[in-house]
Amino acid sequence: MAAAARARVTHLLRHLQSTACQCPTHSHTYSQAPGPSGKTADYAFEMAVSNIRYGAGVTKEVGMDLQNMGAKNVCLMTDKNLSQLPPVQIVMDSLSKNGISFQVYDDVRVEPTDGSFMDAIEFAKKGAFDAYVAVGGGSTMDTCKAANLYASSPHSEFLDYVNAPIGKGKPVTVPLKPLIAVPTTSGTGSETTGVAIFDYEHLKVKTGIASRAIKPTLGLVDPLHTLHMPCQVVANSGFDVLCHALESYTAIPYSMRSPCPSNPIQRPAYQGSNPISDIWAVHALQIVAKYLKRAVRNPDDLEARSKMHLASAFAGIGFGNAGVHLCHGMSYPISGLVKTYKAKEYNVDHPLVPHGLSVVLTSPAVFTFTAQMFPERHLETAGILGANIRTARIQDAGLVLADALRKFLFDLNVDDGLAALGYSKDDIPSLVKGTLPQERVTKLAPRAQSEEDLSALFEASMKLY
């Protein structure tokens, strides 16, 4: 414990020494000179979020929205399963009723790849659309964001906007077309964020595009769409909300993130925890704790499923600006290196570890590890999840939160760790290798992590109970 305390004190002292920022817009009177590396911590954060409209049946307004935007030629993106279901039919009826011409693209892949992104991009380029509508879960919304971006910047190479170090991570400076997102799952919060995630097949890792410029113009959050979701989809989507909230709330503060951008356009979408994101994260976590189990166990519980739909958006607002960290960074190779595992109640023809499941399975180990920094926040979140924290010691915050998470997952019959997905200790080097490129998110973790640390976290996540 003494070593942990010393590490925390050292970290905080470094934070205090580096919080001032030498920026063109920052008064030199109150700033300090950069350190030897030339890097200083940021001094500001931004809140960027899509317009959100919530209400049962609100999807039927989409045609009027597009008409108000002056759209005449719209791309409607969805997947094969949803294309025959009510959410898409309602959108098509609304478009037709309001005289909006549209083409349907229903080849979105669940857990998209660079290849499936490029197929959608090619469709968008050929269509010369003046607006987009995405109806589906995170896979559909992310695919539509990418299609809009690259159709609006037709001469860009695919890796130009992909996050470094896999891509070039260029800032988006071209104007995009309006995009309306209609989420049908309660997990990714993609209707609120400027992030599009995909599997980069060449390296077998997940990466993405992160820019405020690609966030949807409008998100239509209609709780009626949640009633069609299978129970396992509700659970795994809810785990994504859970970890979005936990990770954004326990991420390093924005004022500890460095370097400070020399130009505001270079400020990353994921900036670190901040006072506004904190509010959304805590509120989302409270909803998850109260309603997720109900939403999973009773498909007809409209109240619970409606609350989870809101929680997804709330957590999206939080993490879309604060960011996520280790659970998500480690989840990408878990999904990308899947062997034969196929999740129940997912109608796919390929092995699949749902994103929310890949994220939550490492959460007990991760938060045990990160709680050395900001233990008060870890203990607070454990209390929200139902742990008795009145007599808990602050130094046990990570263990208390980990136990609360294990109980929460056990109550929902979650697979017993990575081993249940087909992974073994022999896979750990590959899982670590797949995590290392995820520095955009892992650097927001409250504790730095070595390869040995990551190996230990994966090993601890092989079994949960």
Curated annotation (Swiss-Prot):
Gene3D superfamilies: 3.40.50.1970, Dehydroquinate synthase-like - alpha domain. One of its GO terms (cellular component) is mitochondrion. Keywords: Acetylation, Lipid metabolism, Mitochondrion, Oxidoreductase, Phosphoprotein, Transit peptide. Coiled coil: none annotated. It is found in: Mitochondrion. Its EC number is 1.1.99.24. The modification Phosphoserine is found at residue 450. GO terms for molecular function: alcohol dehydrogenase (NAD+) activity; hydroxyacid-oxoacid transhydrogenase activity; metal ion binding. This is Hydroxyacid-oxoacid transhydrogenase, mitochondrial. The gene is Adhfe1.
